[in-house]
Amino acid sequence: MHENQQPQTEAFELSAAEREAIEHEMHHYEDPRAASIEALKIVQKQRGWVPDGAIHAIADVLGIPASDVEGVATFYSQIFRQPVGRHVIRYCDSVVCHINGYQGIQAALEKKLNIKPGQTTFDGRFTLLPTCCLGNCDKGPNMMIDEDTHAHLTPEAIPELLERYK
């Protein structure tokens, strides 16, 4: 690569539905930057994650620098920048859940799934991610599987709970 060349981003094209939805969201805001989180969520909902090429495609639609979209994508832990499993498990590792014993939940998840935080099971079924807070502190330890919140967890309940998610 020459010193003035930018690295190549993989070929990526937004679907017509994604582009239309992003343009629709953009019109709700005076500053198109404000629509970047919604645009990222639109792509993630369709594809399961947000590839690098999508950052540039979203930026083009919004008419803003790709670095602005990248900044939003990396700031929000709910935006996935690499492929994830069919079900994403987010367990809370905040101070309150620490006091309430999240470590036992984490250990039970790691044992049952045979993965560490940040990894995806061999069959692509689950991705395990720690999250600083799920906003459910009075009911800890907590975790979310996809959009479902599970509270007052015990390590013993983990195997049965995971069986609900095929």
From Swiss-Prot:
GO terms for cellular component: membrane; NADH dehydrogenase complex; plasma membrane; respiratory chain complex I. Its cofactor is [2Fe-2S] cluster. Keywords: 2Fe-2S, Iron, Iron-sulfur, Metal-binding, NAD, Quinone, Translocase, Ubiquinone. InterPro entries: NuoE-like, NuoE_dom, NuoE_N, Thioredoxin-like_sf. It is an enzyme of class 7 (translocase). Binds 1 [2Fe-2S] cluster. [2Fe-2S] cluster binds at residues 92, 97, 133, 137. It catalyses: a quinone + NADH + 5 H(+)(in) = a quinol + NAD(+) + 4 H(+)(out). The keyword Ion transport does not apply. The keyword Iron-sulfur applies. Its EC number is 7.1.1.-. GO terms for molecular function: 2 iron, 2 sulfur cluster binding; metal ion binding; oxidoreductase activity; quinone binding. Pfam families: 2Fe-2S_thioredx. One of its GO terms (biological process) is respiratory electron transport chain. It comes from the Bacteria. Belongs to the complex I 24 kDa subunit family. NDH-1 shuttles electrons from NADH, via FMN and iron-sulfur (Fe-S) centers, to quinones in the respiratory chain. The immediate electron acceptor for the enzyme in this species is believed to be ubiquinone. Couples the redox reaction to proton translocation (for every two electrons transferred, four hydrogen ions are translocated across the cytoplasmic membrane), and thus conserves the redox energy in a proton gradient. Composed of 13 different subunits. Subunits NuoCD, E, F, and G constitute the peripheral sector of the complex. This is NADH-quinone oxidoreductase subunit E.
